[in-house]
Amino acid sequence: MTAFNSLFSLDKKRLKKLQRTLNTINSLKGQMATLSNEELQAKTTEFRKRLVNGETLDDICAEAFAVVREADKRVLGLFPYDVQVIGGLVLHQGNTAEMKTGEGKTLTATMPLYLNALEGKGAMLLTNNSYLAIRDAEEMGKVYRFLGLSVGVGVSDNEEEDRDAATKRAVYSSDIVYSTSSALGFDYLIDNLASSKSQKYMPKLHYAIVDEADAVLLDMAQTPLVISGSPRVQSNLYKIADELILSFEEQVDYYFDKERQEVWIKNQGVREAERYFRIPHFYKQSNRELVRHLNLSLKAHKLFERGKDYVVDDGEIKLLDATNGRVLEGTKLQGGVHQAIEQKEHLNVTPESRAMASITYQNLFRMFTKLAGMTGTGKTAEKEFIEVYDMEVVRIPTNSPVRRIDYPDKIYTTLPEKIHATIEFVKQVHDTGQPILLVAGSVRMSELFSELLLLSGIPHSLLNAQSAVKEAQMIAEAGQKGAVTVATNMAGRGTDIKLGKGVSELGGLAVIGTERMKSQRMDLQLRGRSGRQGDIGFSQFFVSFEDDLMIESGPKWAQDYFRKNRDKVNPEKPKALGQRRFQKLFQQTQEASDGKGESARSQTIEFDSSVQLQREYVYRERNALINGESGHFSPRQIIDTVISSFIAYLDGEVEKEELIFEVNRFIFDNMSYNLQGISKEMSLEEIKNYLFKIADEILREKHNLLGDSFGDFERTAALKAIDEAWIEEVDYLQQLRTVATARQTAQRNPVFEYHKEAYKSYNIMKKEIREQTFRNLLLSEVSFNENGDLQIYFI
């Protein structure tokens, strides 16, 4: 057990306990091997009975792990190593296991998934993409089925397939489900748009293991999953706003802080806009849409870079995943930003649709009773994992020692120097036949390096968002002798790079990074492509003072150094800066960048807390209606509330001479078009009783017509009101966040401003739901068609 020695000294208390459990599991190895297949399979029923009789998962953990270990050997021919068992124990505890590339995370997960599925509440493994989910479910599913558990797959290899509720219900009722994080998120949102029990399929979220946990739970945490609905009225302001913004001068008409990624219109820009549009007051309420479009255009031009944040493919804007450079198919920026980028690129501006429902990964995964994660790089973000998800990160030792050499960065003053030095280094390594993975920070830079390699006569493959369809083939060939692969950071995660014949003797895979990424974890992922399962290899990064990392997060003295020395260097004779302070500088700058990323994610949580509270409230009320339970939007209760509120309004705000008009208008707008006048002499109590009488008569008539279907009618009326109000609220909250963020330039706390306005909007939404339900119940027309189906027409 020497592999644990160094780790024990760092994390003695945590791993000693795991070691004791591992010893117990190992002691059961012989016993499990003597069992017949039938006896081994019978253990599942035994475990479930023991749980019913009061034992806990921890009580049966060692024995259950030993059972799965033996099943893995019999079914797959693979017996999990001790380090994989340790990883499985960490996952069972609801923590994140940091396991290096090639250490067998897929097999590791079989043990905690089996154990946690025994409770009958469901266990999920969520991967990065559909291919991995389907592959792992097929391969590992053999083990679970051998042990008597059912396995479901939440995704399909046919992207066009639209699964119905019954199919999804069968998937999610399985003991173990393999899916992707995005598929789960969208299924959750769709499930909460259901209008009847038959359309619902999602169980309570119990236990999940998230693969590439740091990428999903941290890096993608700020990206909401959004279901879009009906389009907004198409705006013609995008083009006008774009034209004006192009005439603006940076730091004169608008302020741009690249380090903080903030941009806003200054007073001079406001005056220019007022002159351009011939309006006296730019920020007047009537100019709200104009102000919004100008800010959107400004963001599109300054905060989103082609080749880095998005690509243009066949006339469409396609977003890039910041964590891996891959295209986010089917994903669009919300709130009009996407349309502003389309205008910036002179493309057809697509309709801006309203958000019907949305949720962030943070809030989705915080709904699980127990959450675990697997990743190759999580330890450096342990503090954030603990604060956000209450998950520790445990570094699992490798089964074989890591033999990769990570060389210190080669640091240059200017970008041209760095590029020249990188190409020369690639030539030297390529001459030895050693395979090379050259990683650039953006699509644009990857294409530049590709052109320079072509000019140097070095054949290579180019892997970026534009060529992702060939990814599997390129990665499979990247470890072959003489191979050179130029890629964006999408090469950092995914399929393992296996060394070809004779490559180990040449020194293994050479990973050459052309800049430090915004997060140390991304660099560690890239380094980890070399040295898989004890393979030999090395990594070398080339950096400069002109890299995005240094421009956005570097200290002032570094910027001063660059300005002072940039004209003193010869790009064709690059000179590396060897002083220790420069090595320290890039390390500290990356740490600062990591800190900014953490702060931004923390702010996302703060912003999203309002949305989450409202979402929980709306979904709870919807489910109460669907399940026939009493809730705040019980139709009977709403009749009383709306009429009582109207009477209170008459009593406090309406003059006596306007009373009849107000009552008649209320009846006509909300209750009935067959208006019956009221007497001037009627008291408020008599008016109240009169309104209740009208409501009772209308509902009695509908009840007589609908019979047993009347309950369905009431529920549908309330659900329609909730959904319409919630769609408006989700859309409004997205717009509000954009406005609130801009307000921090006025020395206001954007989160406080957002919560204040969101709370107002929340109360308005609840009032609107009650009033619209009232209208739906009374003003709607109901009938049965010739097939006997209920038809409801809401006004």
UniProtKB/Swiss-Prot annotation:
Domain of life where this protein originates: Bacteria
Gene Ontology biological process: intracellular protein transmembrane transport; protein import; protein targeting; protein transport by the Sec complex
GO terms, molecular function: ATP binding; protein-exporting ATPase activity
Listed EC numbers: 7.4.2.8
Annotated InterPro entries: Helicase_ATP-bd, Helicase_C-like, P-loop_NTPase, SecA, SecA2, SecA_CS, SecA_DEAD, SecA_motor_DEAD
Pfam family, one: SecA_DEAD
Reactions catalysed according to its record: ATP + H2O + cellular proteinSide 1 = ADP + phosphate + cellular proteinSide 2
Residue sites binding ATP per the record: Q84, G102, E103, G104, K105, T106, D496
Keywords: ATP-binding, Cell membrane, Cytoplasm, Membrane, Nucleotide-binding, Protein transport, Translocase, Translocation, Transport
One GO CC annotation: cytosol
Predominant location: membrane
UniProt family annotation: Belongs to the SecA family.
Protein name: Protein translocase subunit SecA 2
Organism: Streptococcus agalactiae serotype III (strain NEM316)
